[in-house]
């Protein structure tokens, strides 16, 4: 069966300096093969985290990825205005790939 990634919430807002948490639930085991992306309007997606918790080059440690079974979490702490974007999870287990529906993060200054 195809992997389905259920991402929640669809939208979240927090103040500068705050913390947001985004969840992705995989419909089946994907081990640690999960990446997180940030996309801003008019720009291609930027990989933030791969293999569940490994930060991509240049990504600050305010971004943290974690896993509990088939549930994956992206936590963004010490929010900055520049963090306002849409975030996506992606499973890339075996030859299968599936994206979550996205979470819009609104940062209130």
UniProtKB/Swiss-Prot annotation:
<keyword id="KW-1064">Adaptive immunity</keyword>
<feature type="region of interest" description="Complementarity-determining-3">
    <location>
        <begin position="90"/>
        <end position="98"/>
    </location>
</feature>
<keyword id="KW-1280">Immunoglobulin</keyword>
<dbReference type="Pfam" id="PF07686">
    <property type="entry name" value="V-set"/>
</dbReference>
<dbReference type="GO" id="GO:0002250">
    <property type="term" value="P:adaptive immune response"/>
</dbReference>
<feature type="region of interest" description="Complementarity-determining-2">
    <location>
        <begin position="51"/>
        <end position="57"/>
    </location>
</feature>
<dbReference type="InterPro" id="IPR036179">
    <property type="entry name" value="Ig-like_dom_sf"/>
</dbReference>
<feature type="region of interest" description="Framework-1">
    <location>
        <begin position="1"/>
        <end position="24"/>
    </location>
</feature>
<feature type="region of interest" description="Framework-2">
    <location>
        <begin position="36"/>
        <end position="50"/>
    </location>
</feature>
<protein>
    <recommendedName>
        <fullName>Ig kappa chain V region 3374</fullName>
    </recommendedName>
</protein>
<dbReference type="GO" id="GO:0019814">
    <property type="term" value="C:immunoglobulin complex"/>
</dbReference>
<dbReference type="InterPro" id="IPR050150">
    <property type="entry name" value="IgV_Light_Chain"/>
</dbReference>
<dbReference type="InterPro" id="IPR003599">
    <property type="entry name" value="Ig_sub"/>
</dbReference>
<feature type="region of interest" description="Framework-4">
    <location>
        <begin position="99"/>
        <end position="108"/>
    </location>
</feature>
<feature type="region of interest" description="Complementarity-determining-1">
    <location>
        <begin position="25"/>
        <end position="35"/>
    </location>
</feature>
<dbReference type="InterPro" id="IPR007110">
    <property type="entry name" value="Ig-like_dom"/>
</dbReference>
<feature type="region of interest" description="Framework-3">
    <location>
        <begin position="58"/>
        <end position="89"/>
    </location>
</feature>
<dbReference type="InterPro" id="IPR013783">
    <property type="entry name" value="Ig-like_fold"/>
</dbReference>
<dbReference type="InterPro" id="IPR013106">
    <property type="entry name" value="Ig_V-set"/>
</dbReference>
<keyword id="KW-0391">Immunity</keyword>
